[in-house]
Amino acid sequence: MTPLLELKDIRRSYPAGDEQVEVLKGITLDIYAGEMVAIVGASGSGKSTLMNILGCLDKATSGTYRVAGQDVATLDADALAQLHREHFGFIFQRYHLLSHLTAEQNVEVPAVYAGLERKQRLLRAQELLQRLGLEDRTEYYPAQLSGGQQQRVSIARALMNGGQVILADEPTGALDSHSGEEVMAILHQLRDRGHTVIIVTHDPQVAAQAERVIEIRDGEIVRNPPAIDKVNVAGGTEPVVNTVSGWRQFVSGFNEALTMAWRALAANKMRTLLTMLGIIIGIASVVSIVVVGDAAKQMVLADIRSIGTNTIDVYPGKDFGDDDPQYQQALKYDDLIAIQKQPWVASATPAVSQNLRLRYNNVDVAASANGVSGDYFNVYGMTFSEGNTFNQEQLNGRAQVVVLDSNIRRQLFPHKADVVGEVILVGNMPARVIGVAEEKQSMLGSSKVLRVWLPYSTMSGRVMGQSWLNSITVRVKEGFDSAEAEQQLTRLLSLRHGKKDFFTWNMDGVLKTVEKTTRTLQLFLTLVAVISLVVGGIGVMNIMLVSVTERTSANDIPMDVGAGASYVLYHLFFRYPCKVLPAVGGALGITLSLLIAFTLQLFLPGWEIGFSPLALLLAFLCSTVTGILFGWLPARNAARLDPVDVLARE
């Protein structure tokens, strides 16, 4: 009869400083299907090392080990895990149950890595627990079970994928005598069903119940009686779980790992909340500062635009403060007409101004009287609360009409509902009111100067008696570069005057400077917020590093149930909060930032607080990457461990 497990000259050594310590010394052993074998020996004899090699948790340094005729030395880590999963079931002295899973869920674990569908897993787990007398304990957690019940759960787990070979490491060592007898009775039943049972023990009473007792001493077999010729294999032990594709195993394991992650979060609510708090605060800080900072920037830019954006002012002289008489009359009405004909000009308005007294009945105030064209209000984005601007007929006829600002309207006509049509004195000239320009609300503050506007032809011809302009304001068409327009304007007037006796002031340059300044400030504030996010990420990293490091012990790495290195990797990475926790924290942080923004909107109604999808996405990705980076690395290191090293940590 061909042996099920065949070992020839197996040697296993471990480094100890500069030397190699040989633990197994030429072990040759055959174990047949359906046998119940006990391996006995004192502590340090090598029996546990032999068990690990038998169960494909470790590889021999030299020698040949065949399982059902297959040489395990030719298999890689994942293929070895598959062989282990399909042929072996482990029963440990300390049970190695997952504390946050129920008895039923613990039994299901081996089938998760075999790719079995959830419904099939559930039915199989319930069947096994019922067979072992735990049908009323399926929803109990390990802490709610006695030692004997926990060991029965571990036996059911060992049988989940068929368990052709049951390896029991001191199965009664942590149990009282009654529970120990129950466990041994179950092992006898498994033998009767056709399972091969290998018991590793130092208890002679337990070993005596086996059909064959193999004794090992100092790494060598000192007693190895022959196998019994007639072995009961009537039951057969074909694997319950059929081999499935790697992709199906991955998808099944991935889904189950995410489910386990949520269970882990729910089982430790306070720790979960405290761990997420750093991420929540960091995300909320980043998003809130970006959103509020952008709103503040838009507010400032709106104020700049209210002054007149995309405009170029032309003044006589070399620069501000130049009062040289030869330059005061540099700008003429013909210059205005020439500028208005340029293709890049949306509108152009002249300006002549003088401080005058305004009178209505017994009210007398000082104001700045400005001669402008009807386009002036469009250039500066001003609107009217009453009436309208000048028309071309009024400009050509030097009409005695005037537009008031809201401050003058309030002082001259405090009790009138409609002032259009009223007549006031501008200096000594009577003028009819045709409109009231709406006051511009600005976070930069409103001007204290009272202003009125008259047609520039009226101002220069009837009031001031001058034929030149104090300034010209040009609004550049949308789509034209303001800097290029300024160059063309300078070239045009220089050619007309034969010299450069004027200077320009481009508001677009001011706007760009303000934008650059606000961007710098916003970047600074964002960096401050990012620091808080990094601090929160470091806290999460610490928790995850500790969690993953702690969970590389055998009771949390499923290598003992046949998970390969790739499955251990995503088991640790996805099952624990390494991905779920930062993602949830990021979502809660974004929610908190939305609440903060809406609250600010109530207290700052003038601010247009909007949310950038890019900012929200980047903040969320940042928190998720934190979990990926600081969860993946420890999980990868854990996946590279040999199963026997993992078991040794317990």
From Swiss-Prot:
Its main location: membrane. Gene3D superfamilies: P-loop containing nucleotide triphosphate hydrolases (3.40.50.300). GO terms for biological process: response to antibiotic. Keywords: Antibiotic resistance, ATP-binding, Cell inner membrane, Cell membrane, Membrane, Nucleotide-binding, Translocase, Transmembrane, Transmembrane helix, Transport. It comes from the Bacteria. One of its GO terms (molecular function) is ATP binding. Its EC number is 7.6.2.-. Part of the tripartite efflux system MacAB-TolC. MacB is a non-canonical ABC transporter that contains transmembrane domains (TMD), which form a pore in the inner membrane, and an ATP-binding domain (NBD), which is responsible for energy generation. Confers resistance against macrolides. This is Macrolide export ATP-binding/permease protein MacB. It comes from Shigella dysenteriae serotype 1 (strain Sd197). The gene is macB.
